[in-house]
Amino acid sequence: LNLAKSGKKVLLLEKHNIPGGCGTTFIRGRYEFDVGLHTLWGIGTDEKKGHVRKIFEELDVYDKIEFIRQDELYTINILDKLELPIPFYKDKFLATLQSFSPEEKDNIIKFQELNEAIAQEFYRLYDELGGEINSENFPLIFEIGTRPAMEVMDEYIKNPIVKMIYSVYLGTLGIPPKILPYLLFGFSYEMNTGHHVKGGAQSISNALVEEFERCGGTVMY
């Protein structure tokens, strides 16, 4: 899309009969399913724009997609022992964690603040592409970004249920917290709200293709 916007002649060859790859939907009976999208991070708010929103705005597609704020991150269900909806809003999320370990209330807040701090450094990597990446500009990434996530979490939290709640969502990354780099863990738990997309992920792909063709690009299926 950037090439097309710069005036280049661009041909996109797609093996499927619709655009999008993992960003597609399909219909079975009365239901429409998303192929891969569970929730979309990085949209943020008007006051605090996320990195994904910034990219969509740069590509002139943000206003062509309708985002719906998501109230729950996920629900944990352990046999018949526990059914726990995990809220997406920061205050409610922290309150849920603290209810299982009141004695670690302050440490839970400190750990979440650390998650958000390293996430902000992660976001700035995009803003400073082409700039100098060093320990002065990105101290947390250099200091603890490559340490195992569980090792960092152990320094703040001891309660196994709180650790479990923090670890469940990381299944989407396919790497357990004991070896997952902390940078990816902290980035995943920067609670700047998640969103669904009206029409599913296909709406994102369709908006990108529409803008691509508007800029002179050609798509062949």
Give the location of each predicted region.
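N-terminal glycine-rich phosphate/pyrophosphate-binding loop and immediately adjacent elements
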Residues: 1-114
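Generic, well-ordered alpha-helical scaffold segments in large soluble proteins
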Residues: 3-6, 152-156, 168, 207, ...
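Beta-strand segments within the central parallel beta-sheet cores of soluble alpha/beta enzyme folds
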Residues: 13-15, 68, 163-169, 210, ...
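Active-site-adjacent bridging/hinge elements
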Residues: 15, 179-184
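Acidic/polar loop patches that form or flank catalytic/metal-binding clefts of enzymes
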Residues: 35, 48, 164, 220-221
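Conserved active-site and cofactor/substrate-binding residues in soluble primary-metabolism enzymes
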Residues: 47-50, 144, 148, 199, ...
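Rossmann-like flavin
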Residues: 79-179
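Helical element adjacent to the flavin cofactor pocket in flavoenzyme catalytic cores
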Residues: 185-221
